[in-house]
């Protein structure tokens, strides 16, 4: 059986990992074995955090809405419940934007939820 030399294949595989590890500190960006470990961990973290980002932003929006709602004399849960009863279909992202950028507009939304 003929001998198979994997020069190009192996080099390309290593260079792909080292390209992904560019910018990593110290040997994590230059040595293949440590770079491979760091890249694997970085890709795992990226995968996890793409899902976590959605949760984190929702928590941020709820905290902002709650703070603005309490300034208008109503809790977050009562505000959301009132909006559902009043059939005001506005999502939490837009409510948070209203609370931060247009407090007077947010007051009208709170008034609609109270009635």
From Swiss-Prot:
Pfam families: Ribosomal_L20
Gene3D superfamilies: 6.10.160.10, Ribosomal protein L20 (1.10.1900.20)
Recorded name of the encoding gene: rplT
Lineage of source species: Bacteria, Bacillati, Cyanobacteriota, Cyanophyceae, Synechococcales
One Gene Ontology cellular component: ribonucleoprotein complex
SUPFAM superfamilies xref list: Ribosomal protein L20 (SSF74731)
Protein name as annotated: Large ribosomal subunit protein bL20
Family affiliation: Belongs to the bacterial ribosomal protein bL20 family.
PROSITE patterns in the record: RIBOSOMAL_L20
A GO biological-process term: translation
Tree of life domain: Bacteria
Transmembrane segments: none
Function as written in the Swiss-Prot or TrEMBL entry: Binds directly to 23S ribosomal RNA and is necessary for the in vitro assembly process of the 50S ribosomal subunit. It is not involved in the protein synthesizing functions of that subunit.
GO molecular function: rRNA binding; structural constituent of ribosome
Statement: the UniProt record of this protein carries the keyword Ion transport: no
InterPro entries on file: Ribosomal_bL20, RIBOSOMAL_L20_CS, Ribosomal_protein_bL20_C
Keywords: Ribonucleoprotein, Ribosomal protein, RNA-binding, rRNA-binding
């Amino acid at each position: 059986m003929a001998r198979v030399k994997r020069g190009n294949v192996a080099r390309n595989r290593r260079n792909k990992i080292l390209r992904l590890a560019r910018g990593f500190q110290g040997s994590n960006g230059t040595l293949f074995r440590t770079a491979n470990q760091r890249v694997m961990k970085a890709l795992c973290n990226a995968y996890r955090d793409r899902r976590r980002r959605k949760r984190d932003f929702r928590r941020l929006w709820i905290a902002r809405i709650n703070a603005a709602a309490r300034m208008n004399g109503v809790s977050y849960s009562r505000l959301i419940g009132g909006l559902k009863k009043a059939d005001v279909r506005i999502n939490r992202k837009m409510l948070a934007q209203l609370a931060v950028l247009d407090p007077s507009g947010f007051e009208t939304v709170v008034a609609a939820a109270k009635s």
